[in-house]
A protein has these predicted regions:
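Cap/lid and interdomain-hinge subdomains that line or gate substrate/regulatory clefts
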Residues: 53-110
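Short beta-strand segments
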Residues: 23-28, 95-97, 122-126
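Short, basic/aromatic-enriched C-terminal tail that caps enzymatic domains
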Residues: 211-226
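Active-site beta-strand/loop microenvironment that shapes enzyme catalytic pockets
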Residues: 99-149
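A short aromatic-anchored loop/beta-hairpin motif
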Residues: 1-64, 69
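Solvent-exposed alpha-helices and their adjacent loops that cap or buttress functional pockets
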Residues: 15-16, 112-116, 211
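Polyanion-binding loop/helix "lid" in catalytic or ligand-binding cores
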Residues: 10, 154-208
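Actinobacteria-biased recognition of intrinsically disordered, low-complexity terminal regions
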Residues: 9, 59-63, 193-196, 222-226
Length: 226
């Protein structure tokens, strides 16, 4: 599938940055932290397979939230994609509830970005699940415009645009990724600056489509040293 191939390419670029820790962020029933070694199931996709998040050798620093034992589906998919790469370093997960307020999502992102000197975020976030009549939530004429806004923001590393996404509208459109994108926006506030200068950011959308009536974007944001 094209989206999976694009995601793996983007993740390989991410791990090639050699971060101190890689945090998989995604929607979850409640806001919670996950440590390496915790597992989840792909049964939600009809695949009877268990997936483990990295190795159970994480250095133990807490990234906030209430620790839990079973990965949410979004984090399980992220862990599965991460298995397809050469990453063997420190990894953790952070699940974000769809009920998370914008300001709280930003605070989570800021905290994650400060967790280590070099933090990489793998953000697993779906667009609207109401793009077509056959979509999981049926058709909503607002869905395409919503997802176009998200795709443009991710392509341009436009954190401000992500922060303008409305929680109520996102829930109506079944756009599960809203809070996770806003965590990314919060983290970018730290990644994009230092004590002495503003860092430049290279960003690009590698994939934008809506297979099965669900909006997906694969993009990367990478900050330079100046």
């Amino acid at each position: 599938m094209a989206v999976r191939e694009a995601a793996i390419r983007a993740i390989r670029r991410l791990v090639g940055w050699n971060p101190d820790v890689l945090v998989v962020v995604g929607d979850a029933p409640r806001t919670a932290a996950y440590a390496a070694g915790q597992s989840g199931s792909l049964a939600g996709f009809g695949v009877p397979r268990s997936v483990t998040l990295g190795r159970a050798t994480h250095h133990g620093r807490q990234c906030g939230g209430q620790p839990t034992s079973s990965l949410s589906l979004s984090l399980t998919v992220g862990a599965w994609l991460l298995e397809q790469t050469s990453w063997r370093g420190d990894v953790a997960g952070f699940g974000v509830s769809a009920m998370t307020a914008v300001r709280d999502a930003v605070q989570i992102g800021v905290a994650l970005a400060r967790w280590a000197a070099r933090v990489a975020l793998l953000v697993m976030a779906d667009g609207s699940a109401r793009r077509t009549a056959a979509a999981p939530g049926g058709f909503d004429e607002r869905a395409a415009a919503h997802d176009a806004t998200v795709a443009a923001a991710l392509a341009a590393a436009d954190a401000s645009a992500l922060l303008r996404l409305e929680p109520d509208l996102s829930r109506e459109l079944m756009a599960a990724g809203r809070a996770s994108w806003q965590v990314l926006a919060g983290a970018s506030l730290i990644a994009g600056s230092s004590d002495t200068h503003v860092r430049s950011c290279v960003s690009r959308a590698e994939y934008v489509d809506a297979p099965y009536g669900v909006g997906y974007v694969v993009a990367f944001w990478e900050w330079g040293s100046r």
